[in-house]
Amino acid sequence: MKFQPLGERVLVERLEEENKTSSGIIIPDNAKEKPLMGVVKVVSHKISEGCKCVKEGDVIAFGKYKGAEIVLDGVEYMVLELEDILGIVSSGSCCHTNSHDHKHAKEHEACCHDHKKH
């Protein structure tokens, strides 16, 4: 399904949180807080033609109670206003933009995560 955000909005896929503590305790999905970072999947025409400050593939940080959650083709996304983006963590070259698994992302230098923990 294709989705095009309107106004100054972006479609973001949240990054997955670690489901295990450093001591090996598995955290159930309902006890985990949702991550406050994600990969920009689609940028509205107003942003792509205007400020160009955020682009597809950027890893961004956003506020805890910001945006609207939607589900497209069984995948959860966030629709965020440009002003709700706190900053860019990594620009366009994170392993998540290429659908790589964390386990295989160690060779990607520009990835947004510290893979020593994984």
Swiss-Prot record:
Localization (cell): Cytoplasm
GO BP: chaperone cofactor-dependent protein refolding
One Pfam family from the record: Cpn10
Gene3D superfamilies documented for this protein: GroES chaperonin (2.30.33.40)
GO cellular component, one term: cytoplasm
UniProt entry tagged with the keyword ATP-binding: no
Subunit: Heptamer of 7 subunits arranged in a ring. Interacts with the chaperonin GroEL.
NCBIfam families given in the database record: PRK00364.3-1 (NF001535), PRK00364.3-3 (NF001537)
Stated family: Belongs to the GroES chaperonin family.
Function: Together with the chaperonin GroEL, plays an essential role in assisting protein folding. The GroEL-GroES system forms a nano-cage that allows encapsulation of the non-native substrate proteins and provides a physical environment optimized to promote and accelerate protein folding. GroES binds to the apical surface of the GroEL ring, thereby capping the opening of the GroEL channel.
Name of the protein in its database record: Co-chaperonin GroES
Gene designation: groES
